[in-house]
C-alpha cells in the first residue's frame, strides 16, 4: 500500500503472454487487467504500447502520469508521495527513482547488481539532477507524464533496451528526465552466472541498437 490517496491511483496490469494465474490474482486485488497474446512482438515496450493505445481507444488516457513497474518489484510505501513532490514542479517529462535490490544478500552476483544500481543512482543520476542536466530511466520504477505518452501516440520504443531508447529520445527532443532519490523501488536481481550473462548480453545488444 502507498502513503498516498488511493482514489488518485489506478493500477493496470498487463498479462503479457501469461500462462499462470497473474491476471486472476491481480484482478481479485482490484487491478484493471489487460490480456495480451503476441508471440512475434515480444518485450516490455510492446506491452506498454499495447496498454497505452487501449487506454486511448477507451477514452481513459487523461492521466497526469504513468508509473511503470516490473512484476517482481516491491515498491516502498512512500514511493508515489516522493515522486509526486518532484513531479509537481512541472519541469520533467519523466522521472526515475532509486532502483534498489530486493535480494542483495543472496550471493555475490545479486550483490554486484545492487552495487551497480547504487553507482547509477548516487554517481550518475544524483549529480546530473544537481547540475540540472538529463538523467536516465533504468528499466523499472519510473514515471512518464501523460503528455509525453499522448505526444508519442503510445510507447514506440521497442529495442532491447527500450529504457535507454526512451532516454535518448527525450534528450534529442529537449525533454528533461529527473531523478527522485527518496523514491525507492526494490528489484529482484539474477543469482546465477547464466542469468546474468544472458541479461548483460541482451543489454549489450540493446546499447548497440540505440547507437545504430
Regions found by a protein language model. Name each.
Residues 132, 158, 167-185:
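Catalytic donor-sugar/metal-binding loop of nucleotide-sugar-dependent glycosyltransferases
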Residues 35-60, 78-160, 197, 201-212:
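Long helical/loop segments within the catalytic core of UDP-sugar-dependent glycosyltransferases
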Residues 21, 69-86:
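Acidic donor-binding/catalytic loop of UDP-sugar-dependent glycosyltransferases
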Residues 1-8:
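Short, acidic, metal-binding catalytic loop of nucleotide-sugar glycosyltransferases
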Residues 66:
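Short aromatic/hydrophobic "clamp" motif used to bind/position activated sugar donors
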Residues 63, 71-73, 162:
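Short acidic donor-binding/metal-coordinating loop in glycosyltransferase active sites
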Amino acid at each position: 500500500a502507498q502513503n498516498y490517496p488511493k482514489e488518485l491511483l489506478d493500477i493496470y496490469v498487463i498479462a503479457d503472454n501469461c500462462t499462470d494465474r497473474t491476471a486472476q490474482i491481480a484482478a481479485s486485488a482490484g487491478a484493471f487487467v489487460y490480456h495480451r497474446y503476441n508471440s512475434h512482438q515480444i518485450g516490455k515496450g510492446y506491452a506498454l504500447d499495447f496498454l497505452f493505445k487501449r487506454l486511448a481507444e477507451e477514452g481513459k488516457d487523461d492521466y497526469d502520469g504513468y508509473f511503470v513497474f516490473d512484476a517482481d518489484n516491491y515498491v516502498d510505501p512512500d514511493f508515489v508521495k516522493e515522486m509526486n513532490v518532484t513531479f509537481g514542479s512541472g519541469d520533467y517529462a519523466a522521472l526515475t527513482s532509486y532502483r534498489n535490490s530486493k535480494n542483495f544478500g543472496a550471493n555475490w552476483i545479486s550483490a554486484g547488481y545492487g552495487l551497480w544500481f547504487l553507482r547509477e543512482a548516487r554517481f550518475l543520476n544524483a549529480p546530473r539532477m544537481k547540475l540540472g542536466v538529463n538523467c536516465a530511466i533504468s528499466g523499472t520504477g519510473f514515471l512518464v507524464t501523460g503528455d509525453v505518452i499522448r505526444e508519442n501516440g503510445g510507447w514506440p520504443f521497442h529495442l532491447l533496451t527500450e529504457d535507454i531508447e526512451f532516454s535518448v529520445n527525450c534528450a534529442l527532443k529537449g525533454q528533461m528526465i529527473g531523478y527522485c532519490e527518496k523514491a525507492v523501488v526494490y528489484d529482484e536481481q539474477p543469482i546465477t552466472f547464466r542469468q546474468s550473462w544472458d541479461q548483460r548480453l541482451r543489454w549489450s545488444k540493446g546499447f548497440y541498437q540505440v547507437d545504430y
